[in-house]
Amino acid sequence: MARIAGVNIPTNKRVLIALQYIHGIGPKIAGEIIEKVKIAEDRRVNQLSDQEVLQIREIIDRDYVVEGDLRRETGINIKRLMDLGCYRGLRHRRGLPVRGQRTHTNARTRKGPAKAIAGKKK
């Protein structure tokens, strides 16, 4: 099992799919990494040599923000919005949808489970 960017990627999957187990790497970036290392798309992780795994690891460390660093950066950006007191920051602070979705109905994922209203019956 290869360990890249602090994540154990599955050995029996294709490299393109296995790289997507790393937070911050999707299909597009996984394809770019495979092109840079010049690996065939149908190769599986257990068929990679140690040198190829090392090259993948170096490319990810050098060119991309992934895993803990990406999570930290995202958290810092949200905290910055909340400290500024801008509209998006207020929505984050109140636990409501940030991107303009309706909240009269729906938005239960963001707002949490429904709260019972006292005295309201059919």
Swiss-Prot record:
Transmembrane segments: none annotated. One of its GO terms (molecular function) is rRNA binding. Keywords: Ribonucleoprotein, Ribosomal protein, RNA-binding, rRNA-binding, tRNA-binding. Belongs to the universal ribosomal protein uS13 family. Part of the 30S ribosomal subunit. Forms a loose heterodimer with protein S19. Forms two bridges to the 50S subunit in the 70S ribosome. Pfam families: Ribosomal_S13. The keyword Ribosomal protein applies. GO terms for cellular component: cytosol; small ribosomal subunit. One of its GO terms (biological process) is translation. NCBIfam families: uS13_bact (TIGR03631). It comes from the Bacteria. PROSITE patterns: RIBOSOMAL_S13_1, RIBOSOMAL_S13_2. Located at the top of the head of the 30S subunit, it contacts several helices of the 16S rRNA. In the 70S ribosome it contacts the 23S rRNA (bridge B1a) and protein L5 of the 50S subunit (bridge B1b), connecting the 2 subunits; these bridges are implicated in subunit movement. Contacts the tRNAs in the A and P-sites. Residues 99-122 are annotated as: Disordered. This is Small ribosomal subunit protein uS13.
